[in-house]
Structure formats: structure tokens, C-alpha cells
A protein has these predicted regions:
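C-terminal interaction segment
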Residues: 2-70, 77-124
């Protein structure tokens, strides 16, 4: 279970399904002997949400916009019902590009050298 929380612009929190946390962020918290390793205010390299019937609309209409405002580098929405992945990637000009994947191999920018077979994400 993911208990990491990402602080939003209004001071509340979201708990993504999966998040890649930079090593430097974890090390900084350890150096400060912080007891709170699960709250991050800075932009994350990769945030993943899994679409569900109960929260799918909220994930796309609200959380996606907040992740983009934070400047998260790559945001994925896995849609298990139609077996697709929508990826938003932050570009140098500050805008996000959107790509929809239905098959093949995905290479997350946040994890150089990692290749993920899309079909494997939807195996039971």
C-alpha cells in the first residue's frame, strides 16, 4: 500500500497509486532525521494513477491538473478496462504532451534504461 502523500497547492494531499521519489529527497529527509518521509512538496519524476469507476473522473479532472501545477515530470493514468495508458510528459517549454499507448513497450523518462511491456501492466 502506498502511503506517500503529495502536497497540493491548497495544502491538502493526494496519495497516488505509484510514485517515483528522487533519491535526493529521501536522503534530505534522512539527513534531517525527519520522522515524516511520506510528505513531498517538490515535483516528482513519475506519478501513476490507476483509473477506477469510483475515482476515475476525479483523477483526470482534479488530480491530473494538480500534478501538472506541481510540475511533476511524467504522469501516467492506467486504464484497466480498455487496457490503455495515457502519459503526460512535461516539456522544456513548460507544457505537457499527451500520448496514449495501447500496446508495446513504454520507457519512463524518470527511470532511464527501464522498459515496461504495456501488456504486463494489465496481467491478473
Amino acid at each position: 500500500m502506498n502511503t506517500m502523500r503529495l502536497r497540493t497547492s491548497d495544502g491538502s494531499f493526494y496519495v497516488p497509486d505509484v510514485t517515483v521519489v528522487p533519491r535526493a529527497s529521501v536522503q534530505a529527509a534522512l539527513d534531517l532525521r525527519s520522522t515524516r518521509l511520506d510528505v513531498y512538496t517538490e515535483a516528482m519524476p513519475l506519478v501513476v494513477e490507476v483509473w477506477s469507476r469510483s475515482t476515475g473522473g476525479y483523477d483526470v479532472e482534479t488530480k491530473l491538473l494538480e500534478y501538472q501545477l506541481r510540475g511533476d515530470a511524467e504522469i501516467w493514468l492506467l486504464h484497466p478496462y480498455d487496457r490503455t495508458l495515457t502519459a503526460w510528459r512535461l516539456q522544456a517549454d513548460g507544457r505537457y504532451t499527451e500520448s496514449i499507448y495501447r500496446e508495446g513497450v513504454i520507457e519512463p523518462v524518470a527511470l532511464p534504461g527501464v522498459r515496461i511491456e504495456l501488456a504486463a501492466l494489465f496481467e491478473a
